[in-house]
């Protein structure tokens, strides 16, 4: 398995938390500099695009940009959006790494990430059932946030009802804070490390 994506994700997590906390503590005192920050950001990744996108003909940076919503008063909502984006990316990385493991173990599983978790758990010691459950929870949470408007439904509840007591109720709104990203990362790393042990002896 290629661990670089999850290591890169961790570095991104730290960088975003660091930047947001300093901006929050400073009450976004330089928010008028947003436009110049965007122009500087345009040079962060070069080349900007490595294929012949028609969008490259579009002008960039000519229009003055400013915050439409005050970042101080909307910090909580912005933080929740950041958590959502990072959580989505973590699930994508986890899914790709599970696919790599399944191939190396000559296993087959369903298309959904939870099916891959269940299949790979067959080679993981039962001591780490907590990691399996946490990985399933991560997938369910991603589905709630991205596919059901932030509210639990019967399908997402079915993923966690075996170990979340009491289980969420249909229509109940989900909220996830930054500490959960660290907990889910620990679960993913633990689960995949245990799978890796099985791969080494297979």
What kind of feature is each model-predicted range?
Residues 106-123, 154-172:
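Short, charged amphipathic alpha-helical segments flanked by flexible coils
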Residues 1-88, 96, 129-141, 157-202:
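Extended intrinsically disordered or low-complexity regions, especially N/C-terminal cytosolic tails and loops
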Residues 94-109, 146-149, 153-156, 192-202:
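Long, hydrophobic, amphipathic alpha-helical segments used as structural scaffolds
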Residues 98-140, 147-148:
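Short non-catalytic regulatory patches outside canonical folded cores
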């Amino acid at each position: 398995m290629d661990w670089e994506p999850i290591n890169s994700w961790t570095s991104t997590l730290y960088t975003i938390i660091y930047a947001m906390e300093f901006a929050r503590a400073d009450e976004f005192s330089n928010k008028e500099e947003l436009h110049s920050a965007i122009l500087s950001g345009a040079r962060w990744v070069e080349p900007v695009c490595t294929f012949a996108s028609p969008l490259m003909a579009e002008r960039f940076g000519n229009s003055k940009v400013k915050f439409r919503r005050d970042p101080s008063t909307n910090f909580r909502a912005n933080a929740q959006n950041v958590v959502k984006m990072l959580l989505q990316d973590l699930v994508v990385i986890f899914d790709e790494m599970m696919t790599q493991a399944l191939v190396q173990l000559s296993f087959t599983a369903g298309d959904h990430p939870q099916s891959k978790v269940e299949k790979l758990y067959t080679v993981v010691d039962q001591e780490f059932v907590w990691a399996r459950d946490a990985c399933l929870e991560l997938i369910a949470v991603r589905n709630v946030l991205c596919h059901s408007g932030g509210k639990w439904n019967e399908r997402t509840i079915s993923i966690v009802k075996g170990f979340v007591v009491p289980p969420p109720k249909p229509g109940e709104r989900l909220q996830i804070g930054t500490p959960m990203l660290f907990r889910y990362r620990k679960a993913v790393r633990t689960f995949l490390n245990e799978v890796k042990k099985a791969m080494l002896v297979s």
